[in-house]
Regions:
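Short aromatic/hydrophobic "clamp" motif used to bind/position activated sugar donors
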Residues: 82
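Cell-envelope/extracellular polymer assembly enzymes that use nucleotide-activated donors
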Residues: 1-3, 21, 31, 179
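Acidic donor-binding segment of Leloir-type glycosyltransferases
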Residues: 19-59
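A conserved hydrophobic helix/loop-capping motif in glycosyltransferases and polysaccharide synthases
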Residues: 2-14, 18, 25, 35
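The conserved acidic donor/metal-binding loop of glycosyltransferases
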Residues: 86-90, 114
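Glycine-rich, basic loop-to-helix element that forms the pyrophosphate-binding segment
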Residues: 60-77
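Conserved donor NDP-sugar-binding/catalytic core segment of glycosyltransferases
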Residues: 94-127
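Conserved nucleotide-sugar donor-binding catalytic segment
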Residues: 135-222
Length: 259
């Protein structure tokens, strides 16, 4: 029923934690595709063997980054639904079971759920848990995602046919997941599932992985958002005005025609 795509880059401890959360799932009809773009360590054979054949592990060359890894994995999927799980996030044991039960009565094109944020200190090994927050994004809509995306990639489930001819932009430094979601939403709608069994693990803002991806660079964020606004026009006047207002709040004057 599910293919779970996990791109990874030189984070063996975090990847092992993610895989262990999949091993612990009460629902077993899924396949995991791990794509490693660094080949800097021995694959986690113990974790993979516990998946009992329900995995594909790929070591790829070329430019590092999750976009190309996800694109490669998408070509190998043959399930009803596809999930993109970051290599530092985890699923609680009943997550896939809850998803499967919700799909018994309907087959939404895109499904999303709430989540928990697990703050942690990654300067120690293994990471030390600091605090938790529960986050509801039940009010997220298709229109709101065209203004600002609050849905973590790991909280989304895509019906396989939605992904036909879709690919992640490998040239983007940040927000390639938002770009991908917007492309999928042009012809499809979002459905919310009120569960919060996805754990989004976060390190300090100045952690190396955040600096590498540009997530702390306000100038990159604004530039990327404006590019996405041009690439994916708002669906209605209200969304265009909301985009303009959001940019104005950041001190950026953007003509309505660019929103």
């Amino acid at each position: 029923v599910f293919t779970i795509i996990v791109p990874t880059h030189n984070r063996p401890t975090l990847l092992s934690r993610t895989l262990k959360s999949l091993i612990a799932q009460s629902y077993s009809n899924f396949h995991v595709i791990v794509v490693d773009d660094a080949a800097a360590y021995i694959p986690p054979y113990e974790d993979l063997s516990a998946l009992k054949g329900r995995y594909t592990y790929i070591v790829r060359s070329g430019v590092s980054g999750p976009a190309e890894s996800r694109n490669m994995a998408m070509k190998l999927t043959n399930s009803r639904y596809v999930m993109f799980l970051d290599d530092d996030d985890t699923l609680e044991p009943g997550h896939l079971q809850s998803l499967a039960m919700s799909l018994e009565s309907n087959s939404p094109a895109l499904l999303f759920c709430d989540f928990k944020v697990q703050y942690e200190d990654r300067t120690v090994e293994p990471p030390q848990h600091l605090s938790s927050d529960t986050v509801s994004i039940a009010d997220a809509t298709k229109d709101s995602v065209f203004v600002r995306n609050r849905i973590p990639n790991s909280c989304l489930l895509y019906r396989a046919d939605v992904l036909s001819d879709m690919s992640y932009d490998t040239e983007m430094d940040i927000y390639e997941d938002w770009d991908f979601l917007l492309a999928c939403l042009k012809l499809n709608d979002l459905v919310h599932l009120p569960i919060n069994s996805v754990n989004i693990h976060k390190s300090q803002a100045n952690a190396p992985e955040n600096m590498r991806r540009g997530n702390t660079r306000d100038d990159l964020i604004a530039q990327a958002m404006l590019m996405l606004y041009k690439r994916h026009p708002a669906l209605n006047e209200e969304a265009r005005q909301a985009r303009q207002s959001l940019m104005a709040g950041a001190g950026i004057a953007s003509p309505l025609t660019d929103c």
